[in-house]
Curated annotation (Swiss-Prot):
GO biological process, one term: L-proline biosynthetic process
A GO term for molecular function: pyrroline-5-carboxylate reductase activity
Keywords: Amino-acid biosynthesis, Cytoplasm, NADP, Oxidoreductase, Proline biosynthesis
SUPFAM superfamilies reported in the protein's UniProt record: 6-phosphogluconate dehydrogenase C-terminal domain-like, NAD(P)-binding Rossmann-fold domains
Enzyme superclass (EC): oxidoreductase
Presence of keyword Magnesium: no
GO cellular component, one term: cytoplasm
Protein name: Pyrroline-5-carboxylate reductase
Gene responsible for this protein: proC
Keyword check for Glycosyltransferase: no
Lineage top rank: taxon: Bacteria
Pathway: Amino-acid biosynthesis; L-proline biosynthesis; L-proline from L-glutamate 5-semialdehyde: step 1/1
Biological role: Catalyzes the reduction of 1-pyrroline-5-carboxylate (PCA) to L-proline.
Family label: Belongs to the pyrroline-5-carboxylate reductase family.
Amino acid sequence: MEHKKIAFIGAGNMVRAIVSGLVANGYPAQNITATAPSEARRLPLEQDFGIRTTSDNIQAATEADVVVLSVKPQMMADVCKPLQAIDFTNKLVISIAAGINCSRLDDMLATKLNLVRVMPNTPSQLGLGMSGLFAPIHVTEHDKAFAAELMEAVGKVCWVEQESGINNVIAAAGSAPAYFFLFMEAMQAEAIAQGFDKESARLLVQQAALGAASMVVSNPETELSTLRENVTSKGGTTAEALRTFNEHQLSDIVAKAMQAAVARAEEMEKLF
């Protein structure tokens, strides 16, 4: 990975995860800057990873080859306005803010950007993230490769060909950890109802989930349906549980939930 100068505008949990992954993989800490108005936000990054931090967004972005916008969507316009004075011609801009499309970011920074939009998810904080990426047609393969390598510091990446695909990434991966948490919550609650204490119920559920996910990852050529069928004996307990799920249309519920996530993402784009 080319060791460009990176400026993270923002210093939240996702920035911390990316910086941690980069430094752990040998990226020079002196080439990384993170900005935040609060010293309480900046200091831990400086102390833990040896990177530079500052409250001066303009200086950090001016000196950088790559500018990563990592602020809340509702704050983006205010953060970008002072940055309009910067010449972004030879810079790569990466946005990890939800709900703000490429055209809107061009408007916010008053220029046509070399821009990659990224939609990560929270397991990135453990290096197990899944990020969707989109780049307009004028962005070079070189810049796209750098953006992908940046996000591979915290997990896997998937490119989408149309910007609308970012909203589909939100439904399939960005919001997905919460789906699994909800399912696990329901299982834990029923295990408690059946007599387990809270800690034992959680252990049973989390280890089953970890094992199932690990089996998926360890068998990339095996269809998910085949893995399910391999656990299901005709007339057995698993078959009866799955029959109950199907009777209550679990697949339809999942589809409707993912469609609702996409619809909400589309609505959010109109807000900013």
